[in-house]
Amino acid sequence: MIFDALKWLDLDYSEGPDVGGDYGPYRQSERFDLYGKYAKELVEKGGAYYCFCDHERLENLRERQKAMGLPPGYDGHCRSLSKEEIEEKLKAGVPYVIRLKMPYEGETVIHDRLRGDVVFENSKIDDQILLKADGYPTYHLANIVDDHLMGITHVIRAEEWIPSTPKHIQLYKAFGWKAPEFIHMPLLRNDDRSKISKRKNPVSLIWYKEEGYLKEGLVNFLGLMGYSYGDGQEIFTLQEFKDNFNIDKVTLGGPVFDLVKLGWVNNQHMKMKDLGELTRLTIPFFVNEGYLENENVSDKEFETLKKIVGIEREGAKTLKELAKNSKFFFVDEFSLPEVKEAFLKAIEAAEQVLKDHETSTQDQVNDR
């Protein structure tokens, strides 16, 4: 789904599971053995430790913390186990996870390119699980290992990851690796400033394709999220955006994902697009509306469709809307219930006015 969306939007990439590259494999499922290796290496370096606490103890711990009004978090119970105790439990096959050993004192500072320095007290940060009991890594470990081995220099992600970043910085320190530059982008918001979620909004990019938004329109609209050219320009191509983009100019105000604005932007690109190409893109929507039997049209039919699209694209926000608005070009009998109702009301009103004037003289009518 992600690959399909990127290809549709012409967002090319030089490495990945489907194109290869020098730093593969690119699927975490194919890098599974790496994570266990590096987790145990971190234990040997003193940056992590084995935790043998079972579910019952952890649940009791959470209940006690809740009763005392404390934030939930691991209490470091296994952090002080002796080497002999650890070896004994490992030999006995006691299930374990591997946790990050966060410093108890001091601060961790995130040097964020957009936000400046963000400071966290180490004592308030939990000892994060890095490797689960089933041998699978958590995001925190896999993310750091992969980014290091793949030579990642810049991590650009949503601001919701800021609270996790101190753990990531400590992981880089524990491994002795250079941390990348962190850039945390503002989250997209609904009109009411709430966070966009899958439960409330269509967040799949392919959904917008199926609804009839042009890729040029959607890319343009997304390029306006938290970013401005400065001269008021709102309509641009992907290449223009690439040529002018400066990440230091991204604003942090939480851009609003406004479907009305998206519709306007998309309409601008519909009017700019070559009429023949726009017609070809609209044909599947004509088929979906039942106006065409299939997408195979003759040259003569295509020329007719071009004329229809040329007229209707002026006011349509999407290809789907354009097709719906073209109904009267394809049907013999056409009526709009709301128009019919308004017309009948107008006739009734006129009829009443005439009745009121039945006994009026010409002078009285003129006075009115």
Which ranges hold each PLM region?
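Short, conserved secondary-structure transition motifs
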Residues: Y26-L34, L187-D192
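Short amphipathic alpha-helical segments at helix boundaries and their inter-helical linkers
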Residues: D33, P72-G73, D231-E234
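Conserved nucleotide- and phosphate/pyrophosphate-binding catalytic cores
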Residues: K7-Y13, V119, L130, V145, ...
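Charge-rich, well-structured scaffold segments of protease-associated domains
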Residues: M1-W8, L58, K66-G69, L224, ...
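A glycine-rich helix N-cap at a beta->alpha junction
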Residues: F3-R27
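Active-site cores that bind ATP or allylic diphosphates and position pyrophosphate for catalysis
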Residues: E41-H184, R189-K198, S204, Y229, ...
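Short secondary-structure transition/capping motifs
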Residues: G24-R31, Y50, R157
